[in-house]
A protein has these predicted regions:
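Short glycine/proline- and aromatic-enriched beta-strand/turn motifs that initiate or cap beta-hairpins
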Residues: 19-70, 142-144, 218-228
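Hydrophobic h-region of N-terminal signal peptides that target proteins for export
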Residues: 10-18
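Outer-membrane beta-barrel proteins
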Residues: 29, 51-55, 67, 100-104, ...
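Sec-dependent signal peptide recognition
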Residues: 2-7
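Transmembrane beta-barrel strands of outer-membrane/channel proteins
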Residues: 39-45, 79-83, 133-139, 165, ...
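Predominantly the C-terminal beta-signal and adjacent terminal strand-loop region
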Residues: 170-228
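Gram-negative (and chloroplast) outer-membrane scaffold detector with strong preference
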Residues: 68-149, 154-157, 169, 218-219, ...
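Solvent-exposed loop segments that connect transmembrane elements
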Residues: 21-23, 31, 90-102, 186-209
């Protein structure tokens, strides 16, 4: 995947360079981006992948911070922390029917990831716009414990990938919009598969204990840019 992203980035940069031929510097739609670091505050919405019981964290408002450092060429190293104000359904698998439903509870979901990000126009903007893509890894964590529900979110490993647009008007500030997908594994506790009530199990027959889910995020951010 990284090789593919790199090839796409090189192709776009080459096309961008060719498109500047025939333009005087002051008339070119391309402008050098002379900053090498950025610190971004962002907010948006997290769309969590659902599960059949609804006990895993749901989507909700999202906010966080991102730091990027120029590595060379079109490449940046990006570190990000995101927080989601989420909620989930809680159940008591030792009870049956309505008595098993503990209601919807507020929970906090946190995402930490480290990415390789590529500016598709290199260290230049096109009409003040810089398209970007990113690919990385991280972990997720959640304060999801609700007694007597045995479900635990844990700290699953996560893949992250996405893209976005930077608006760079000049100076030390920019705006950006980003879409990102977080792919991580969820697991149900063994208690969901025990027929302790004599009326069946909490998890439906044939439901896998562990499964992967894609979780999308759309955010808008404001950045402070730094010179090297």
């Amino acid at each position: 995947m990284k090789q593919i992203l790199g090839a796409v980035a090189l192709a776009v940069v080459a096309t961008s360079a060719g498109a500047q031929v025939g333009h005087l510097p002051q008339n070119s739609p391309y402008r050098d981006v002379e900053t090498n670091q950025e610190f971004t505050f962002f907010g948006g919405h997290y769309s969590a992948g659902g599960d059949v019981l609804g006990v895993t964290p749901r989507g909700g408002p999202m906010f966080g911070i991102r730091y990027e450092k120029h590595l060379g060429g079109p490449a940046f190293l990006m570190a990000r922390w995101s927080h989601v104000n989420s909620e989930r359904n809680a159940i008591d698998p030792t009870k049956a029917g309505a008595a098993a439903q503990l209601g919807r509870k507020n929970v906090s979901l946190n995402l930490y990831d480290l990415n390789l990000a590529l500016n598709l126009t290199g260290q230049k903007s096109f009409h003040h716009i810089v398209p970007i893509i990113n690919l990385g890894v991280g972990v997720a964590s959640c304060g999801c414990t609700v007694k007597p529900d045995p479900y635990k979110f844990g700290t699953p490993f996560a893949f992250s990938f996405g893209g976005g647009l930077r608006y760079v008007p000049g100076g030390r500030f920019q705006l950006r919009v980003d879409w990102n997908d977080y792919l991580y594994q969820l697991k149900y506790p063994t208690q969901y598969y025990s027929n302790t009530t004599g009326t069946g199990t909490a998890a439906p027959s044939g439901q896998a204990r562990s499964f992967w889910k894609n979780n999308g995020a759309l955010t808008i951010g404001a950045s402070l840019l730094f010179f090297q």
